[in-house]
Swiss-Prot record:
Originating organism: Geobacter sulfurreducens (strain ATCC 51573 / DSM 12127 / PCA)
Keywords: Lyase, Molybdenum cofactor biosynthesis
Catalytic activity of the protein: (8S)-3',8-cyclo-7,8-dihydroguanosine 5'-triphosphate = cyclic pyranopterin phosphate + diphosphate
Broadest EC class assigned to this enzyme: lyase
Entry protein name: Cyclic pyranopterin monophosphate synthase
GO terms classed as biological process: Mo-molybdopterin cofactor biosynthetic process
Entry's EC annotation: 4.6.1.17
Length: 160
């Protein structure tokens, strides 16, 4: 196994992608936010003191995709062509699954943009609901799918 973010002397570098051809790159990532079922019921019914939690989280996630190189030092600045956030809720369990999809016509993948997008949307949900529920947790930030480029398509298997 090799890590390509290091040179021969072990120093951190940004990977040189200048020789690659741009291709359509897509990645989908997810993050899970767990809270009390009553907190989720209030969130979904619009009974929070901070407004439209999922609407704000959606905008935060989209903005985060565009800001990824400012947060992840060795990621490449990319021209993001599409960023979208979707939410799946399970009221009985009190969970919100954030799903972020990012697309770009680039020389390198958009996995980090999708993961950052999902994570920041989840953090925004936490921030906007923490006053009502101190026990909220964020977990399972994960890549679900990627395609484009030399490595082709990858999809997480169910339960993985």
């Amino acid at each position: 196994m090799s890590f390509n973010h290091f040179d021969d002397q072990g120093r951190a570098i940004m990977v040189d992608v200048s020789g690659k051809q741009p291709t359509l790159r897509t990645a989908t990532a997810a993050a899970t936010v767990s809270m009390q079922p009553d907190t989720l019921a209030d969130l979904l019914a619009g009974r929070t003191t901070k407004g439209d939690v999922l609407g704000v989280a959606r905008i935060a996630g989209i903005a985060a995709a565009k800001k990824t190189p400012e947060l992840i030092p060795l990621s490449h600045p990319l021209a993001i062509h599409h960023a979208a956030i979707d939410f799946d809720t399970d009221q009985a369990c009190g969970t919100v699954t954030v799903r972020a999809t990012v697309r770009a016509f680039e020389r390198t993948g958009v996995e980090m943009e999708a993961m950052t997008s999902a994570a920041v949307a989840a953090l925004t949900i936490y921030d906007m609901c923490k006053g009502a529920d101190k026990g909220i947790t964020i977990g399972q930030i994960r890549l679900l799918f990627k395609e484009g480029g030399k490595s082709g398509t990858w999809q997480r298997e169910e339960g993985q």
